């Protein structure tokens, strides 16, 4: 058992967002990192013989789940696919409320993909807090919609990729692909193995996208970006995403990738239950890095934007707490909707029912936010792993 994972948390003046509802004056009991009880009243007897935290302000919410994380802390996962890189990435993102992530390896050589998978398998075996799987974004993508993905590495699925994708020691296996680059039978085989298929970086027409969904694809990667657009006569991937009610869409809410009106349209179409926040963060997140080498070129940071040498957007420096604030305030969706899009919705997409909410039986992954929705403290599996300087427990 990890240290400090048996305790009580007392919300005495703070709010707790549980199952979509804000409540005050409650107590949460944790045993071995799992929530074993929620009480609507507070008694001094409960804390007499058990360690406890007392929150008198702010809001406690479930930990944020980011399904698309390319780097952080000054390192790209593709460039240094090691266990130590994963630890550093998780540390960089954790201060912004991320308690679970899928490290993302973008289009590259098979050797890089294999090294990334080995690092994730090692992290899971070592129980590195927050590393729950891997996201392969490419290399089975459209040349026309590749974005910053290197064209020389785009390819179909070979036997070497099959051996990688069918591994059972990687936790969550999320694969982004363009439906025109594979067959429905290949999608069916991947889904049957337990992989989750997301569609993206694609110039496919609506019919091709719907066939991929029928084959088992269940998500869309960074909605609007790198995909065929919705028009009056051709729905494209965006239209197919809106029309398929049981699929999930990731969206980058940094004010750069998606116009706020487009973001609201996506929310109207998909709802809080099927629109999820992602960062697509690159190495500068959580560091003072202003530029970095990216394959044969360079990516430069300009404020909150990253662009490659061709002027294309190249990931982001967005963090999950900022994405939640943007959804809650800029889009006026409110805290409850914004948090669900960062917690319960991605948990359902990646089929991890133990994550994504503050409820009995769930893992004690929490974020304590102040009244401006800034992160004060972070717990993963009941272990306090981040505490801001201004955070004070009563």
Swiss-Prot record:
It comes from the Bacteria. SUPFAM superfamilies: Composite domain of metallo-dependent hydrolases, Metallo-dependent hydrolases. Its EC number is 3.5.1.-, 3.5.1.25. In Shewanella sp., the active phosphotransferase system (PTS) specific for the transport of GalNAc and GalN is replaced by a set of GalNAc- and GalN-specific permeases and kinases (AgaP and AgaK, respectively). GO terms for cellular component: cytoplasm. The lineage of its organism: Bacteria, Pseudomonadati, Pseudomonadota, Gammaproteobacteria, Alteromonadales. Zn(2+) binds at residues 137, 201, 222. Keywords: Carbohydrate metabolism, Cytoplasm, Hydrolase, Metal-binding, Zinc. It comes from Shewanella sp. (strain ANA-3). Substrate binds at residues 148-149, 225-226, 233, 254-257, 313-315. PANTHER family: N-ACETYLGLUCOSAMINE-6-PHOSPHATE DEACETYLASE (PTHR11113:SF14). GO terms for biological process: N-acetylglucosamine catabolic process; N-acetylglucosamine metabolic process. This is N-acetylgalactosamine-6-phosphate deacetylase. Gene3D superfamilies: Metal-dependent hydrolases (3.20.20.140), Urease, subunit C, domain 1 (2.30.40.10).
